[in-house]
């Protein structure tokens, strides 16, 4: 495999020590198998009208989360299958991962963001369950 980079980029990742060297050259090349899989994914995405599924998720997300406020919340953002509840203080989310897990939801906050990235095949009741757990965290 060949990876093309400027000398500056090359120098930043080059090392004779395998623990420090960039070992992802093949990650960035046009792997034929990866390209074939990507094309098949696009075909399925279009054939099964995933855009309508994304719109449905977005509508449910807005219905469930628009207007949800708490003094600890900076903002709630929704785009497609992603929802982010951004808080002012990261300590607000300490313990949320276990709290959510105990209620059947796998979620891990990142810094000040409690977020979801919904699979496009999610059922409405599953989506509502996730949002209920998120809201319950702030109401406890």
Regions found by a protein language model. Name each.
Residues 1-140:
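Conserved N-terminal phosphate-binding loop of PLP-dependent enzymes in the Aspartate aminotransferase
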């Amino acid at each position: 495999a060949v990876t093309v980079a400027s000398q500056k980029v090359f120098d930043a990742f080059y090392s004779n020590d395998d623990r420090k060297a960039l070992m992802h050259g093949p990650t960035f090349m046009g792997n034929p198998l990866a390209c074939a899989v990507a094309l098949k994914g696009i075909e399925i995405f279009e054939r099964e009208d995933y855009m309508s599924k994304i719109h449905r998720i977005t509508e449910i997300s807005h219905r469930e989360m628009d207007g949800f406020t708490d003094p600890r919340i900076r903002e709630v953002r929704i785009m497609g299958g992603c929802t982010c509840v951004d808080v002012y203080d990261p300590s607000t989310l300490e313990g949320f991962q276990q709290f959510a897990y105990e209620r059947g939801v796998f979620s891990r906050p990142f810094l000040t963001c409690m977020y979801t990235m919904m699979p496009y095949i999610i059922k409405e009741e599953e989506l509502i369950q996730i949002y209920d757990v998120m809201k319950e965290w702030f109401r406890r």
